[in-house]
Amino acid sequence: MPRVLNLLVLALAAAIPAQAQEPRLGTIDFPTAAAPTAQAAFVRGVLYLHSFEYASAAAAFQEAQRLEPGFALAYWGEAMTLNHPVWNEQDRAGAQAVLGRLAPTPEARQVRAPTDRERRFLAAVEQLYGDSGS
């Protein structure tokens, strides 16, 4: 009998839709100049980032980059996944490498951001990870 019960539990678990296993991250309004598909991946990344799910956030931001390679805030987001202030951890070199994939210098990265708001987010991440260390 326990074997039948185990099989029944396994069958029921397999029948649960995959979306039920997706975490409940909430919603945000974070407008950008990105195309809708890249925007959706970006928003998912921000939601994961705000839930301290750094690996999932990085994957979502990388998906946004794949969908729209020039999407500046997707690189901003991936760089932000390398800052873990709660644990006093920061991968500055890794974040600089992420930003370097967008463009080689802070000035060149600023040009890639199409709106003032997006340029300000990039300026903030440059301050966080910049050469001054401040």
Residue ranges with predicted function:
Residues A41, Y75, D116-A123:
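Canonical tetratricopeptide repeat
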Residues L5-A15:
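Bacterial N-terminal signal peptides
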Residues T37, G70-A72, D116:
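Residue-level recognition of tetratricopeptide repeat
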Residues E63-R66, P104:
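Conserved structural position within tetratricopeptide repeats
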Residues E53-A59, E78-R112, A123-S134:
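Inter-helical turn/loop elements of alpha-helical hairpins
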Residues A20-A33, T105-E107:
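Repeat-mediated protein-protein interaction surfaces in helical alpha-solenoids
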